[in-house]
Design a protein with these regions (language model features):
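A conserved beta-strand element that flanks and buttresses the S-adenosyl-L-methionine
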Residues: 173
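Short glycine-rich, flexible loops that bind phosphorylated cofactors or substrates
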Residues: 180-181, 210
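Conserved beta-strand signature within the Rossmann-like core of class I S-adenosyl-L-methionine
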Residues: 198-206
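Helix-to-beta-strand junctions that scaffold the AdoMet/dcAdoMet cofactor pocket
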Residues: 181-182, 195-197
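Conserved N-terminal segment of class I S-adenosyl-L-methionine
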Residues: 1-167, 188, 204-205, 211-253
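Hydrophobic adenine-recognition pocket in adenosine-nucleotide-binding enzymes
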Residues: 177
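A short, conserved alpha-helix within the catalytic core of class I
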Residues: 181-190
Length: 255
């Protein structure tokens, strides 16, 4: 579920994209990959997609370490995420930051290439940003793209209960994450504990077990959603009986 302004902004960027504009994503990739052209991008993207389609099945994957290694075995997901998120807008999240004040703390949990932080940072330069993800090519790209900004930090979770947050946040996003971890209930509890009173959480959790959408995650989905709905005030709630993607919005009570 996205706001009307987000959808309108996305439509505008899609129009620019069709006209050959909105190429900031390609400029970043070109700088990172030392002169990557649009033609080279499509060659690498196409070959990478074909390779990634069989990557999961190439080795036995039954432990958390096995699952985590999948995302470190190819840089295809850098290309895919930069392309996939090229037209995204986050006015709804920005409105939440604006209400919190000129300064604050934002965490993009499970950031990948950090598309949300990339959109927000220039609009809220006085905020402090924390990126969290596994040590993968995506996180290395995110680290590189914010290398000049001292108000952006990067954290990596350990295994199991070794989770990385140490301070409190006004806004946390945890989008397209929970279905990929073995311990979504533990992750959500960790995130909720590190929300400031009155802080906002944007989160989703699809149910589509198989491959990198872990069966371990699906088994905890109902309890995870119950924890969210019991612990936080729902603006837009998740429901266990809705398996499709819903971008939920919660607020931590001030009491």
């Amino acid at each position: 579920m996205r706001s009307y302004r987000d959808l309108l902004g996305r439509r505008r960027l899609q129009l620019l994209d069709r006209l050959g504009g909105n190429r900031g994503w390609l400029r970043e990739l070109s700088e990172y990959y030392r002169g990557l052209t649009i033609q080279e991008f499509w060659v690498r993207y196409t070959l990478g997609r074909m390779d990634a389609a069989t990557l999961w099945e190439r080795k036995p994957r039954s432990t958390e370490a096995d699952y985590r290694s999948f995302y470190a075995e190819t840089d295809y997901f850098v290309l895919r995420q930069m392309y996939y998120h090229r037209n995204d807008c986050h006015h709804d999240i920005a409105r939440t930051l604006r209400r919190a004040g000129r300064e604050g703390d934002f965490c993009e949990y499970g950031c990948g290439v950090a598309p949300i932080t990339a959109w927000l940072r220039s609009r809220f330069p006085a905020w402090r940003y924390t990126l969290v993800d596994l040590p993968t090519p995506m996180l290395e790209f995110a680290r590189w793209r914010f290398r000049k900004f001292t108000n952006v930090e990067v954290k990596e979770p350990g295994f199991g209960s070794d989770l990385p947050l140490t301070r409190s946040y006004d806004v946390i996003t945890c989008l397209d994450v929970l279905e990929h971890v073995v311990n979504p209930l533990q992750v959500v509890l960790h995130v909720v504990e590190h929300l400031k009173p009155g802080g906002a959480l944007y989160v989703n959790f699809i149910e589509a077990p198989g491959g990198e959408n872990l069966v371990e995650a699906a088994a905890q989905r109902m309890d995870t959603i119950k924890l969210l709905n019991d612990s936080l005030e729902a603006i837009v709630p998740l429901r266990a009986d809705v398996t499709a993607e819903v971008n939920a919005h919660y607020v931590k009570p001030r009491r």
